[in-house]
Every structure is written in C-alpha cells, then in structure tokens.
Regions:
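A conserved helix-loop-beta module that forms one wall/lid of the active-site cleft
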Residues: 95-155
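Short acidic-hydrophobic, aromatic-tinged amphipathic segments that line or gate anion-handling sites
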Residues: 46-52, 124-128, 159
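ATP-binding N-terminal substructure of ATP-dependent carboxylate-amine bond-forming enzymes
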Residues: 1-98
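Short, hinge-like loop/turn segments at secondary-structure boundaries
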Residues: 47-51, 87-89, 110-112, 139-140, ...
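Conserved ATP-binding module of the ATP-grasp superfamily
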Residues: 68, 119-121, 142-145, 158-191, ...
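Short acidic loop-to-helix transition motifs that present clustered carboxylates
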Residues: 53, 126-131, 164, 186-188
Length: 201
C-alpha cells in the first residue's frame, strides 16, 4: 500500500487525537490539519483556513494532492463538505450532507427513527408558547427541551422546574420558531460508532 497524505479538518481534541494516530501510521507520509491547533502543529502542518469555507478546503486538498480527508466537526459535514470532496474524486472519511443531518437536526433524526420503526422517546414539536401548559400536562417531568440546531451540546435543557422549562421554551421559540419536547428516558447512555462502506460494516 502506498503512503498517504492525509488532511484532518477541525481544531479540537478529537482532531488532535486523530492526527496523532495518523502521524504514527506507517501508511501515512504526511498529516495536514485545517485549521488545527497549537498541539497539532508539533505533529502536522497546520493551515490557517476556516473549515466553514468549503471551497477553500477542497482547493487545499487538491493543491496538496491529499489522499484522504478526515472531517471531525459536524457543521462542515452538514454543509456538504464530504459531497464537495467526493465530487472532485477526493476520498473523505465522513458522511454526506444527508447522512450528517441525523446529527445536524434532532427533528430529522426523530422523524427517521419514527419512519423506520426504531424505538425512541415520544416527542412533540411546539411552535406556540400558548401551548406550554398543555406540554406540561402531556409530558411528565423532568421535561426534555431541545433546539433543532447544532449548538455544541448547549441546545438541550432537562429540568423539573416549570419556570426554567418555560424560560427555555419561550427563548428558543423566539430564536428558532419551534422547540422539540421529548419524553425523558432514564438510564445509562451509550454512544456506538459504526464504520461502514458500500459492502457492509
């Protein structure tokens, strides 16, 4: 197998860990990070380009003749970075924009689970603050209130306090036009990552 030049898109600890692993691989000749961080500068070549400038990311990958692009953050994936790279025949580890919407939109994810019969908590979309009391009656506390945006882990409130729940609902409806109210499911939480290609996983 020929050695690869790899571009890691992102600037967080996740991307730093990926860059370390790639730098240690005998199959990788060079690692580039965009934009990277202070830590990645010791093991890779950082490129001061915004990861939200998708065309600039693609242009850099072409210029460097990158063998593989690994995308960490969700936002550029939702915006279609993997699609743009594949359009240029540049291999990319990351879902297309449609697949990334499972992470990018909580409502889309709930609708997909509902359509496919995948068990998930009961939910309701709330668009009018006049229905807040109906929600309090329909869902038992603690109430799970979610924004339908990528919010860096800040888009969810779980509370048994009616004033706190009302405040979150009112402010997020004002921002986004609606919120998602979800049944609270108690228990352990686990994340499972599955890597797959056209032939399986």
């Amino acid at each position: 197998m020929s050695e690869m030049d790899v571009l890691v898109v992102g600037s967080g600890g996740r991307e730093h860990a990926i860059a370390i692993g790639l730098a240690q691989s005998k199959s990788v000749s060079s690692v580039h990070c965009l934009p990277g961080n202070a830590g990645t500068s010791f093991i890779a070549k950082n490129h001061d380009i915004s990861l939200l400038n998708l065309d600039a990311v693609v242009n850099l990958a072409e210029e460097l003749e990158i063998s593989l692009v690994v995308v960490g953050p969700e936002v550029p994936l939702v915006d279609g970075l993997a699609d743009k790279l594949r359009d240029k025949s540049i291999p990319c580890f990351g879902p297309n924009s449609e697949g990334a919407m499972l992470e990018g939109s909580k409502l889309h994810a709930k609708q997909v689970m509902s359509d496919l019969g995948i068990p998930t908590g009961r939910f309701e979309v709330l668009e009018r603050t006049s229905r807040i009391e109906d929600i309090f009656d329909s869902f038992k506390p603690p109430w799970v209130i979610k924004r339908d945006v990528l919010a860096g882990g800040k888009g969810v409130v779980v509370t048994s306090s009616k004033p706190d729940a009302r405040s979150a609902i009112e402010s997020w409806i004002a921002l986004d036009g609606f919120v998602i109210i979800e049944e609270h499911l108690a228990g352990e939480e686990a994340s499972v990552l599955v890597i797959l290609d056209e032939s399986g996983y």
